[in-house]
Amino acid sequence: MKSNQMILVCMMAIAFVCTSVPAWACSSAVISGKVTPDGRPLLWKNRETGHLKNHMVYVKGEKYDFVANVNSDNFPKLKEAWVGSNTAGFALMNTQSYNLEKGDIADDDRGPKNGEVIYRALEICATVADFCHFLDTITKPSGI
């Protein structure tokens, strides 16, 4: 019972924070398996984006199949995912922050690059070590 109460308190706090200030970045939460009934961690994501039409898809990946949230208006033409989990149990999500130093990357170029990286990682990564190796091998600057 304590686990359910802790999850409820966390979700209420997140909801309060997300609705009390204007937000132009994605909201997310990672909930430890220590407080879930089955011991598995939870990922929670809310997309605050101009792409209002989103849906979940099942993708036959190169190495691993996965379920992901995609923009409805440009999928499958663009291979972008914003949160997902693959058949190896690897899960990944993006949160876009617009208050960081931009450097040479325009806001319009930052989001889609995140989506491309997440889509590809869900196809080929099974572990955090795989993902670190993947990040080390992509062309820099990557636009993420």
Name each region found by the language model:
Residues M1-C10:
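Bacterial N-terminal signal peptides that target proteins for export
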Residues Q5, E48-G50, E123:
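Sequence-pattern detector for short linear motifs
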Residues Q5, S20-P22:
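Serine/proline-rich low-complexity intrinsically disordered segments, especially terminal tails, linkers
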Residues V9-T19:
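Bacterial N-terminal signal peptides
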Residues A15-V17, V35, G84, F131:
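A generic structural signal for short, solvent-exposed coil/turn residues
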Residues W24-K113, T137-I144:
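A contiguous strand-loop segment
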Residues G115-I144:
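A surface/extracellular/periplasmic glyco- and lipid-processing/surface-interacting theme
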